[in-house]
């Protein structure tokens, strides 16, 4: 590669600076080869040609070291892309750019979820429980002001003298005691009992066992319980 003409000057210091600058430009142009850049390049090409000729003589394909390094780099890159696609739940396109974009979006969503969980943990346990309970109760049952609920009694036979008894009633003082007294008056044995209360109402679930003539007892017991839990007319 041709060298640049060096400036000739009278001052010794200025001449040194120009020489250093020219040497640096030559080294960049010749990729560090200095004055023998062309000779080194020719030697490299000649060596590569000799290697190609030797490989051809042996019936083998000549492989450049730079080419092999590039193939290894691309292999590692493709492996990382495949691993990224395996952990990102939503991939819009199969290109590398789209995979990286989808991964970034997924990371942002995860960061938002972490911030939301941290905010919820920052609330006091009482407030969090109150919000959750209020939301669930509002969705499950929202009574209206003009709604008029009558007492409901349901009996379902389970066989072997056993029944499921469900009673829906408005909570009034002493009402549950009257229900238990009615069951005892017919010698009904209570096997299990669960009660749910909400907004001034209650729903009780009994598993009972009846002795004696079941048909008569069930008809009379249903009538008695209905009269007990029925809402009195105003």
Swiss-Prot record:
Question: Which PROSITE patterns would you find in this protein's record?
Answer: BHLH
Q: Where is this region: Helix-loop-helix motif?
A: 75-110
Residues forming the bHLH domain are 61-110
List locations, semicolon-separated.
Answer: Nucleus
Q: Name one GO biological process term.
A: regulation of DNA-templated transcription
The region called Basic motif is annotated at: 61-74
Q: Which UniProt keywords apply?
A: Developmental protein, Nucleus, Transcription, Transcription regulation
Q: Where is the composition biased (Acidic residues)?
A: 37-48
Q: Name one GO molecular function term.
A: sequence-specific DNA binding
- Consequences of knocking out this gene: Male sterility due to failure of tapetum to differentiate and pollen to mature.
Q: What is its main location?
A: nucleus
Using the UniProt annotation, give all residue ranges assigned to the region (Disordered). Answer: 1-51
GO CC field: nucleus
Q: Which Pfam families match?
A: HLH
InterPro entries attached here? Answer: bHLH_dom, HLH_DNA-bd_sf, TF_AMS/ICE1/BHLH6-like
Please state which protein family the record places this protein in: Belongs to the bHLH protein family.
Q: What does this protein do?
A: Transcription factor that plays a crucial role in tapetum development. Required for male fertility and pollen differentiation within the developing anther. Plays a major role in maintaining tapetum development, starting in early meiosis. Required for pollen mother cell meiosis. May regulate the anther-specific cysteine protease CP1 and lipid-transfer proteins C4 and C6. Required for anther development. Functions in parallel with GAMYB to regulate early anther development. Functions upstream of the transcription factor TDR and may positively regulate its transcription.
Q: What is this protein called?
A: Transcription factor UDT1
